[in-house]
């Protein structure tokens, strides 16, 4: 992680930690950098950069300032308008863009926003390029073996163009529809669009495949994104599924790069369940390449026991679908993801894609002719307590010797009956303390022991 960019982009409260000036400078640098890179390789055409945004009020402000920076540096800016993060990755990859930018703070409240950078292969941006962007934000331009006083402006006909590119978003919708292996006719599906990016995409896909679709939280007003809605507030979808007698429900977050499910009984199906269900489905069909499902350190203890019972191997990465994808690409794995619902199907996408995930869960249900509750039943989730402690200095809190002693003491007490994980958030000034054990009370007790030490040492904000 850098000074500005965390595991999922540059994120903060709009016009506090993340300002319009930041966005303009990011546009200025990227527009020049990719254009100069092309010129040095004998290509005199302008850089082409595609931009998407979610439904936050501030997303429009950041879009306009990013575009201003891009075209001032000579790049052409292609606007997908309100769309999902995975659609930006798809369009960047398939339409040969130099890079993509998504304006979103994902599951955060409306007053936050973020800038996510995506390379021309549709993958999260590499650390080297992000470091160059951060240097420019701090007034330093050292690139291509040279030092510049400032990124040069484009002039006359070298000033970039702005292109309405809603056609790119529409092609992404068509791509999702093309992945439907079965007709959804007769299946009653609930969708919670979080008043975010999925609001004008998810229903179109499910309707095209024949589902009887019931939608909630698809009326964005700029301030209601993720407000008691979507994958972080799934109780509304649970109620809808039960009251309407639906077969399944899917909840997305603000930029629709994650998905959680609700089975026909109203139970929540987490990202760990999805990894288990699809991993078993792939193994049964002989398509689980390397016989490995990629998880993160936050996946439930019970998931690994279930994989062991099924003879499925697994890998653990740091938290962040960026790290999951890097491992998958390096090792040839087909399925990986996070408990939170960021799931990557590497045959079809290079990032987590919530709508794609829901289509794949529909595929398993229809192929096996089983309800979601039965597909998920073999996975026994261990009780888990996770507490997010907002701190003044997360690195100091994490490395404090007394905190580490408290963690070691809990680890010893749990033995092989559970685990404790204490880590820094990649996107917030937060320490996450998580315990899994056979009993909820034990989990809470051990979480409290560690959190109390963090507070006693004065780290709590």
List where the protein language model places each region.
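Phosphate-binding and adjacent anionic-ligand microenvironments
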Residues: 248, 285-461
């Amino acid at each position: 992680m850098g000074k500005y960019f965390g595991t999922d982009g540059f994120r903060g409260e709009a016009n506090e930690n993340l300002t319009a000036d930041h966005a303009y400078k990011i546009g200025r640098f990227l527009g020049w950098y990719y254009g100069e890179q092309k010129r040095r390789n004998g290509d005199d055409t302008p850089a082409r950069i595609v931009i998407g945004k979610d439904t936050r009020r501030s997303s429009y402000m950041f879009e306009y300032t990013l575009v201003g920076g891009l075209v001032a540096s000579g790049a052409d800016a292609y606007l997908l308008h309100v769309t999902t993060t995975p659609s930006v990755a798809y369009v960047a990859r398939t339409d040969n863009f130099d890079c993509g930018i998504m304006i979103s703070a994902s599951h955060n409240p409306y007053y936050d926003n973020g800038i996510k950078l995506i390379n021309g292969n549709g993958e999260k941006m590499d650390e080297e390029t992000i470091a160059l962007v951060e240097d420019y934000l701090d007034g330093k331009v050292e690139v291509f073996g040279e030092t510049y006083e400032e990124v040069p402006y484009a002039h006359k006909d070298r000033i970039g163009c702005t292109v309405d590119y809603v056609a790119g978003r529409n092609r992404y919708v068509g791509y999702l529809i093309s992945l439907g292996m079965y007709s959804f006719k007769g299946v009653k599906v609930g969708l919670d669009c979080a008043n975010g990016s999925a609001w004008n995409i998810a229903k179109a896909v499910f309707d095209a495949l024949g589902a009887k679709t019931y939608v909630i939280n698809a009326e964005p007003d700029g301030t209601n994104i993720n407000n008691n809605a979507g994958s972080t507030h799934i109780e509304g979808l649970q109620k809808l599924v039960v009251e309407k007698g639906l077969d399944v429900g899917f909840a997305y977050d603000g930029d629709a790069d994650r998905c959680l499910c609700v089975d026909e009984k109203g139970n929540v199906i987490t990202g760990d369940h999805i990894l288990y269900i699809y991993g078993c489905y792939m193994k049964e069909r002989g398509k689980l390449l390397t016989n490995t499902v990629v998880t993160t350190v936050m996946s439930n203890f019970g998931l690994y026991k279930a994989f062991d019972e099924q003879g499925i191997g697994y890998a653990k990465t740091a938290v962040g679908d960026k790290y999951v994808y890097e491992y998958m690409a390096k090792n040839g794995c087909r399925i990986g993801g996070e408990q939170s619902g960021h799931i990557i199907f590497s045959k079809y996408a290079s990032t987590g894609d919530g709508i794609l995930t829901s289509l794949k869960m529909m595929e398993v249900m229809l192929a096996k002719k089983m309800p979601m509750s039965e597909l998920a039943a073999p996975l026994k989730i261990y009780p888990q307590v996770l507490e997010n402690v907002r701190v003044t200095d997360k690195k100091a809190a994490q490395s404090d010797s007394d905190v580490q002693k408290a963690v070691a003491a809990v680890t010893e007490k749990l033995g092989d009956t559970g685990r404790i994980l204490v880590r820094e958030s990649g996107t917030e000034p937060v320490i996450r303390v998580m315990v899994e054990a056979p009993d909820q009370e034990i989990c809470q007790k051990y979480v409290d022991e560690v959190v109390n030490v963090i507070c006693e040492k004065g780290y709590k904000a």
